[in-house]
Amino acid sequence: MKTIMKIFVVLLVLVVGIGIGKFALTPELKPNIAPTFFEGSSQSSSDKNIERLEENTIEVREGDLIQEAVAKAIPGDIILVYPGTYYETVYIDKDDIRLYGVIKNGKRPTLDGKKELNDAILYSGNGITIENFIIKNYKGNGIMGQAGNNFVIKNNWIYDTGVYGIFPQFGKNGLVELNRLSGIEDAAIYIGMCDNIDVRTNEVYESVAGIEIENSRHCLVEYNYVHDNAGGLLAFITPGLPIKDCYDVIFRNNFVINNNHKNFGAPGSVVATIPSGTGLLILAADQITVED
């Protein structure tokens, strides 16, 4: 009887241990704390009834062009894009434009480059929000910013968009949150020469580099699920760029696992030199914090 009880106890401990291990390896991507460097509202469009927004709202439905809505918009306008497939590149060179995908019955609007177009969404205005889109099959970039400040890029699914998935450059005060990216041949999320950027609660996988902070300052990277890339998290200085330094970067509470994917970066590119199996790479950057 004692032998049976011992066996039972051992089996019970094993089962509990396996259960604890399973839950311990489940990434927690829903922090209750406010962003650290980004200053502004991170309220999601899903927090309100997006279809009841009437004032300053332009609607785009399948068969329409999103770019025509941008051309009509004035600063402060909301552009609602309904589910459907849109084959175009969208340029936003105005301030304070909120571009929301409307999710209906689980379906989102899709920007499809058909392996012919270079970029999906390019913005240079300040106060830009881009939320709730599927972006796929572009040759260059999914979402790229050029000197746009006070931006929010949130809850987008970006697949197979060539060089970069999300790429703000020369921007200040930005939030990149709750996005899902894969199949990117350089960096899925690439923060280039920016200041005061929070990168939170994203999932990046099956890309060459997961999240890359290059020549940027005051950046927080936290609560991200970074898995099955060639390299996971990176912070470094690339010589020869207008901004020469990279410092005050915090990597915190990220779940980085199994970054052993084959490096399929373009020959001659910087990321092509990242060894497969790299979880965290810090090169020539200063004041980098890695915790939890």
Whereabouts are the PLM-identified features?
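Right-handed parallel beta-helix
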Residues: 100-102, 108, 126-137, 149-163, ...
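Hydrophobic alpha-helical membrane-insertion segments, chiefly the h-region
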Residues: 14-24
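N-terminal Sec-pathway targeting helices
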Residues: 1-13
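Acidic Gly/Asp/Thr-rich repetitive segments characteristic of extracellular carbohydrate-active
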Residues: 48-87
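Ser/Thr/Pro/Gly-rich low-complexity linker/stalk segments immediately outside membranes or between
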Residues: 25-51
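Right-handed parallel beta-helix/beta-spiral solenoid domain characteristic of secreted/periplasmic
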Residues: 59-62, 83, 96-139
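Predominantly extracellular beta-rich ligand-binding scaffolds that present long acidic/polar faces
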Residues: 253-255, 269, 273-292
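Glycine-rich beta-solenoid repeat tracts in large extracellular/virion proteins
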Residues: 70, 89-93, 103, 118-124, ...
